UniProtKB/Swiss-Prot annotation:
GO terms for cellular component: cytoplasm. InterPro entries: CutC-like (IPR005627), CutC-like_dom_sf (IPR036822). This is PF03932 family protein CutC. Homodimer. Belongs to the CutC family. Transmembrane segments: none annotated. Keywords: Cytoplasm. It is found in: Cytoplasm.
Amino acid sequence: MALLEICCYSMECALTAQRNGADRIELCAAPKEGGLTPSFGVLRSVREHITIPIHPIIRPRGGDFYYTDGEFAAMLEDIRLVRELGFPGLVTGVLTVDGDVDMSRMEKIMAAAGPLAVTFHRAFDMCANPFNALKNLADAGVARVLTSGQKADAAQGLSIIMELIAQGDAPIIMAGAGVRANNLQNFLDAGVREVHSSAGVLLPSPMRYRNQGLSMSADIQADEYSRYRVEGAAVAEMKGIIVRHQAK
């Protein structure tokens, strides 16, 4: 049966995902940055209260995936922490300035991760040649690749995702970016073994007093009075589609 991974940005999100049938959680901070490394407090509390597998993301900042030596050193320390806390896997990705997988740094990541399953995230979609990148990641021992098929969303990139799947069984190709109940069946019919979804909504903050003339963000257009939450009904609907597909 296809596996359903849900991207979560808090304990509340993780609990909702677990209750509604998620098989695995990608744990992140900073949704507006596309996901950054969670804090120690979030890592430990989620590890203690969630029973399904959790793979934290290791990403020190938003933007591109070419990191300074200092940023990369911090990534290795975060990987060691995730390993010490007993997580079964992690999510990360590093590129060269030319858009190739940085194999030298991936070797260090794999060594630091040890027995943990490593997912190479959507840095893959920023690679110059996805097929060369997939071969390099297979050689590195990466467990899976999260990809939208190098398009804005996975529905647009489905043909490339299918080509990547045809390259072999490892790494597992996990489709993500815009995967929802209304298009999930297309991915299942295409033979995708794992799907990744945010299943999220923005809810209004409960704050009653709001200083509309002041922002805590460098982006003055950012809505600071909304909060990201996983929508339980969306997770349950997707899991139901997967179960029914398996029963055919």
